[in-house]
Design a protein with these regions (language model features):
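An acidic, low-aromatic, low-complexity terminal/linker signal
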Residues: 1-157
């Protein structure tokens, strides 16, 4: 593997599906804490939280992708990311691992499960920590910018 094509991704689950985002977007992983609700926002925007003096939107990622809302449980957490100079938090079911992938192994993704093209940037097979079978897990790479969360918040204001 040539290291100049390698990048790190944070993998996480939403229901039975495994997703990944580029590690360079991640600011921190926070335990779930119910956000303060906002009026007149799309239902996938769960509210806002205060992150060391900065108010950030908390997005139900499953809802934003058009699926059933995530059920809150002990491993639920929020991925705080930087998108276009703004911060946002995404509720996920569980963080699985941080893995290095070879960019050349990323396969194009068919837009069959998500109504918006471009949200799934690709698919990659990865070996996740704790996977006893030794088989790789298919991970859908999300393009968080394509979700246009910051634009939706500005429109709701």
């Amino acid at each position: 593997m040539r290291h100049n094509h390698e990048r790190k991704i944070v993998t996480f689950s939403l229901g039975s599906r495994m997703f990944g985002i580029d590690m360079s977007l991640l600011i921190e992983i926070r335990e779930w804490e119910a956000p303060t609700p906002l009026p007149r926002v799309p239902s996938h925007i769960l509210g806002v939280s205060n992150l060391r003096g900065t108010v950030i939107p908390i997005v139900g990622l499953a809802e934003r992708l058009g699926w059933e809302p995530s059920r809150i449980h002990a491993r639920s957490c929020v991925l705080v990311v930087s998108l276009g100079g703004q911060q946002a938090g995404f509720l996920v079911d569980e963080v699985a691992d941080i893995v290095a992938i070879d960019a050349e192994q990323v396969q194009p993704a068919p837009d069959v499960e998500i109504a918006e093209p471009g949200v799934i940037a690709g698919l990659v097979q990865v070996a996740l920590r704790g996977n006893q079978s030794g088989a790789g897990t298919m991970v859908s790479l999300l393009d968080l910018e394509a979700l246009n969360i910051t634009g939706q918040l500005e429109a709701a204001a």
